[in-house]
Swiss-Prot record:
Single Gene Ontology BP annotation: thiamine diphosphate biosynthetic process
Biased composition (Low complexity): 554-566
Family affiliation: Belongs to the ThiC family.
Entry keywords, A to Z: 4Fe-4S, Iron, Iron-sulfur, Lyase, Metal-binding, S-adenosyl-L-methionine, Thiamine biosynthesis, Zinc
Cofactor comment: Binds 1 [4Fe-4S] cluster per subunit. The cluster is coordinated with 3 cysteines and an exchangeable S-adenosyl-L-methionine.
UniProt xrefs under Pfam families: ThiC-associated (PF13667), ThiC_Rad_SAM (PF01964)
Biased composition (Basic and acidic residues): 17-33
EC number per UniProt: 4.1.99.17
GO molecular function list: 4 iron, 4 sulfur cluster binding; carbon-carbon lyase activity; zinc ion binding
Region (Disordered): 1-58, 554-574
UniProt protein name: Phosphomethylpyrimidine synthase
Length: 587
C-alpha cells in the first residue's frame, strides 16, 4: 500500500499496523516534548486510503483474500445498458466520462455457497477481513467473529469491491459515521462526486453513500467504487425509478432486481431497501405534520397505493436475500416512514415499520446476510432513547444506523448542529453508525465545504459518544489534547484536533506571528489572565505545599487542612505573598 503524502497536518504521518502479512492503516501524530520529558506519538484511526490517480483507482487490497477462499468464480455478468446511466445518456447516445481503469469480470458465489462475513463467522471461520478489523479496532479477532456471527455487527465488504479496507459497524466497536454524496438532476458532475468521496474520507468518513439521482448514475458509481477505501452504500430504488422515466407506479420487481444485480456486480457494499413500508401503514401517516419525508419511502408508498398491494420489495424479500448472499452485500433496512418533524416523532407509523424491519432482519439472517437497521430522523431529546430500546428489542441488536436525529426544527443552515446533538445522544445509547447531516440539509446539495463540515461535526458526535460509553482508548485522545493545552504546546493542539486547518486559522486571526505558537496565552484572555498560565505559576510557586495539603475537605477532622500546623503554614505563605507585592506573575 502506498501511503498518502498530503496529510492534514505536518505532524501527521501514515504509520500502519503490520502483522501476519496485513497492513492496517493508522495515522501517527508526532508530539513535542513536555517540560517533564518526551511524549510518545499519538495514533488515530485512518479512513482516507492510499494516494492514487483517480483515473486508475485504488489497489485491489482484498482480491487475493477473496479468491483464496475458493467459493467464488468470475462470470460474464449482466449486459451493460445505456439506460443504466439514465435518460440523459439515452438522449446523448452515450455516458459521459466513461470509467477506463481496470474492469475485471464480476465475482459471485459458487452454487450452494454463501460468501458473507456472517456465513464465515457462523461457521467458526476468522477471515482476513475479521483479522484486519480486529487490528484496526484493537480487539481480539475472535470477539469480532462472535459479534458478526450474532448479527450485532457487520463488515460490509462486497466481493466486487476489493479496494475497500475492512471496517466494522456495531455498538461494541467505535461509533462510525457515514457521508452522503451524489449528484442530482440540477447539479454536480462525476469529477465533483469523486472529489467529495476523497474529501469525506480524508476527514474521517467511515462509509459513503452514493445517492445520485441525476445523469450518469452507473458511471458515477463506478468511479466512486473504484476509488473508495471505505464501504459504499446506495438506495437502488433511485436508479430503478430513473429507468421507468420517474413514474413510481411503473416500477416492477424485474426492473428493480436487474438494478440490484447491476450494483452488486459493480461492488456496492450495502443497499438501503425500504421493504418495511407496508400498505396498512400508509394511512397512519395522513395526520402527520410532514407526511412521508423519505424519498424511498414515498416512492414505495406511491407504488403500494397505485397497485393496492404490498410492495415488491416486501413480497420478494427472500429473493433479495439470496442475491445479497452471493456477493456479500449487506442490507441497510430503510426507515421509509421516519419522522420528518418533531411533531411526528415516535408515532404509530414509525414504530409499525420498525417492528416489520425487525421481522425482516430475522429473515435475512436465515440466509446469512448481514443487516443494519436505519433510524430517524427528527426526534426531541427526551424521546431518543426509546428508539434505541425498541430497535434493540425488535431487531435483536442488529446495528442501528440513524440520520441524526435532529432535536429541533428551527435552524435551517445549522442542521449539522441540531442533528449532532441528537446523534451524540443516540450513539451513547447504542447506535452503531451515524449518517451525517450537512449545513445544507433541507436547503440544497452539499458542496465540498459542506461535506467537510458534516464529517467533522459527526466525528465529534461519534467520539463524544465513545467517551461516554467508556470505549477503551477513546478518552486518551482528549487527555492528549488536554495535556498539550495545559503545556501551551500549540502545534500539538492543532495536530491533535479533528480539523487542524480551522484551529490554526482561528488562532492566527489574532495572533498570526510564529512566536505566538509557543506563547503561554492566547487572544481570549491575553498574557495576564490566562487561567492555565496562572495555574501553572501556582504549581511552580506552591507545588510542595499543595502536595502536602492534599485535598481540602476530604477525610476526617484530623486532615491536614484542619490541623493547626497547616493553618499556620498557610498564614505564613500569605504574609510572604503580600510582602512580595501580591503579584501572581513575579517580574
Amino acid at each position: 500500500m502506498t501511503p498518502t503524502q498530503n496529510e492534514i497536518h505536518p505532524k501527521h504521518s501514515y504509520s500502519p499496523i503490520r502483522k501476519d502479512g496485513l497492513e492496517v492503516p493508522e495515522t501517527e501524530i508526532r508530539l513535542d516534548d513536555s517540560p517533564s520529558g518526551p511524549n510518545e506519538p499519538f495514533r488515530i484511526y485512518r479512513t482516507r486510503g492510499p494516494e492514487t490517480d483517480p483515473k486508475q483507482g485504488l489497489p485491489r487490497l482484498r482480491e487475493s483474500w477473496i479468491t483464496a477462499r475458493g467459493d467464488v468464480a468470475t462470470y460474464q455478468g449482466r449486459e451493460r445498458l445505456l439506460i443504466d446511466d439514465g435518460r440523459s445518456a439515452m438522449r446523448r447516445g452515450q455516458a459521459s466520462a466513461e470509467w477506463k481503469g481496470q474492469k475485471p469480470a464480476p465475482l459471485k458465489a459458487l452454487p450452494g455457497k454463501r460468501v458473507t462475513q456472517m456465513a464465515y463467522a457462523r461457521a467458526g471461520v476468522i477471515t482476513r477481513e475479521m483479522e484486519f478489523v480486529a487490528l484496526r479496532e484493537h480487539v481480539d479477532a475472535e470477539f469480532v467473529r462472535s459479534e458478526v456471527a450474532r448479527g450485532r455487527a457487520i463488515i460490509p465488504n462486497n466481493v466486487n469491491h476489493p479496494e475497500s479496507e475492512p471496517m466494522i459497524i456495531g455498538r461494541k466497536f467505535l461509533t462510525k459515521i457515514n457521508a452522503n454524496i451524489g449528484n442530482s438532476a440540477v447539479t454536480s458532475s462525476i469529477e465533483e462526486e469523486v472529489s467529495k468521496l476523497q474529501w469525506a474520507t480524508r476527514w474521517g468518513a467511515d462509509t459513503v453513500m452514493d445517492l445520485s439521482t441525476g445523469d450518469d448514475i452507473h458511471t458515477t458509481r463506478e468511479w466512486i467504487i473504484r476509488n473508495s477505501p471505505v464501504p459504499i452504500g446506495t438506495v437502488p430504488i433511485y436508479q430503478a425509478l430513473e429507468k421507468v422515466n420517474g413514474v413510481a407506479a411503473d416500477l416492477t420487481w424485474e426492473v428493480f432486481r436487474d438494478t440490484v444485480i447491476e450494483q452488486c456486480e459493480q461492488g456496492v457494499d450495502y443497499m438501503t431497501i425500504h421493504a418495511g413500508v407496508l400498505l396498512a401503514y400508509i394511512p397512519l401517516t395522513t395526520r402527520r405534520v410532514t407526511g412521508i419525508v423519505s424519498r424511498g419511502g414515498s416512492i414505495m408508498a406511491g407504488w403500494c397505493l397505485a397497485h393496492h398491494r404490498e410492495s415488491f420489495l416486501y413480497e420478494h424479500f427472500d429473493e433479495l436475500c439470496k442475491i445479497f448472499a452471493q456477493y456479500d452485500v449487506a442490507f441497510s433496512l430503510g426507515d421509509g416512514l421516519r419522522p420528518g418533524s418533531l411533531a411526528d416523532a415516535n408515532d404509530a407509523a414509525q414504530f409499525a415499520e420498525l417492528k416489520t424491519i425487525g421481522e425482516l432482519t430475522q429473515r435475512a439472517w436465515e440466509y446469512d446476510v448481514q443487516v443494519m437497521v436505519e433510524g430517524p430522523g427528527h426526534v426531541p431529546l427526551n424521546m431518543i432513547q426509546e428508539n434505541n430500546e425498541l430497535e434493540q428489542k425488535w431487531a435483536a441488536d442488529a446495528p442501528f444506523y440513524t440520520l441524526g436525529p435532529l432535536v429541533t426544527d428551527i435552524a435551517p443552515g445549522y442542521d449539522h448542529i441540531t442533528s449532532a446533538i441528537g446523534a451524540a445522544h443516540i450513539a451513547m445509547g447504542g447506535t452503531a453508525m451515524l449518517c451525517y447531516v450537512t449545513p445544507k440539509e433541507h436547503l440544497g446539495l452539499p458542496n465540498r465545504d459542506d461535506v467537510k463540515t458534516g464529517v467533522i461535526t459527526y466525528k465529534l458526535a461519534a467520539h463524544a459518544a465513545d467517551v461516554a460509553k467508556g470505549h477503551p482508548g477513546a478518552r486518551a485522545w482528549d487527555d492528549a489534547m488536554s495535556k498539550a493545552r495545559f503545556e501551551f504546546r500549540w502545534n500539538d493542539q492543532f495536530a491533535l484536533s479533528l480539523d487542524p486547518d480551522t484551529a490554526i486559522a482561528y488562532h492566527d486571526e489574532t495572533l498570526p506571528a510564529e512566536p505566538a505558537k509557543t506563547a503561554h496565552f492566547c487572544s481570549m484572555c491575553g498574557p495576564k489572565f490566562c487561567s492555565m498560565r496562572i495555574s501553572q505559576d501556582i504549581r511552580d510557586m506552591f507545588g510542595d505545599q499543595i502536595a502536602e495539603l492534599g485535598m481540602p475537605g476530604v477525610g476526617d477532622s484530623s486532615s491536614a487542612v484542619a490541623s493547626s500546623g497547616a493553618q499556620e503554614g498557610m498564614a505564613e505563605k500569605s504574609r510572604e505573598f503580600i510582602a512580595g507585592g501580591a503579584e501572581v506573575y513575579r517580574r
